[in-house]
Amino acid sequence: MELITGNCIPHIKVPELSPEEKALPYSKFYTDYPLYPPNPLQQQILDAGPMKVEDAIPIEHWLDWLSPAGYPKVVYGYTMMPDGSGFYIEYSTTAPTWQGKWRRWYGKWYNQHPAELPEGRGNLRYKIWNPIDHWDHKFINGENDKDGVWSVETLDLGATGDPSKGMPAVSHNIDLLEYGLSPEKKKELEDADCRVEACWEEFDGPGHHLVLRFSRPCPQGGRESLNCEWMGYWAKDGKIIRDEETPVDETYLKNVLMHNTIERAHLAQVLPDLYEAMNG
């Protein structure tokens, strides 16, 4: 991750766009919005090293902590688990002015390949979200996520300098009622305006990840999100399955947490203006 410093707020150097990409009307949302590193508090936590393993959420209790109030003991951190799998948790907030319709629109828009770009050049709509790591993203069936979502990203904070070299992956949404979430708990969460969803990812090569996303009203206004990932696990037929072939170590975990931290803040900066420009 190379920072541009000098007479400016330090920000991350991003790959140059192709002439075809620069010609697209929304390319300015890639070029004109600086990509910033994690804020100082987040960076301090990241640099302190892994969290205590006993403070992580074990896979056998992956849904137990979901509640309209209260927090896990640690809400931002990463660690290797005793069985060789990896875990991280990420806490973030959105401002009271944030509108959920922006994100719902973006989720459909960036999963459609731009007609103006030939296949193999990546997807600028997706690159806008995280220019140093994102390359391509699309619905497998071309219409929705029913059959899975295919993506390519590097998750190394631009270390390779070429996001197209990332490992392809396919994500599959799951119904949490089939994996231990009771109808009563689901109703309790919905009544409190909490949202929870999960998916598992399979990589083109060894590896599976299980992802849980949870958001609810923030006491200070807006919404707060708690997202977790268990690297080395996936889901099928109502069961959580261990994949011991999944490659993961502390460096990878830290990079993924930094990647997600950077892109979450960047999308909050870009998306309101992008939505207005494309839907105004």
What is the predicted role of each segment?
Residues 252-270:
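Short, hydrophobic-biased amphipathic alpha-helical segments
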Residues 126-206:
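Glycine-rich portal/gate segments that line the openings of hydrophobic small-molecule binding cavities
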Residues 2-145:
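Hydrophobic ligand-binding cavity/cleft-lining segments
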Residues 121, 126-137, 181, 230-235, ...:
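Structured surface interface patches that mediate subunit assembly and partner/cofactor docking
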Residues 111-112, 266, 273:
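A very general structural signal that marks isolated residues within well-ordered alpha-helical segments
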Residues 92-98, 153-156, 197-200, 214-215:
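Short beta-strand element of the conserved SAM-dependent methyltransferase core
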Residues 4-19, 59, 188-258:
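Beta-strand/loop substructures that line and gate deep hydrophobic ligand-binding cavities in soluble
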Residues 269-280:
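Short, highly charged C-terminal tails/helix-capping segments
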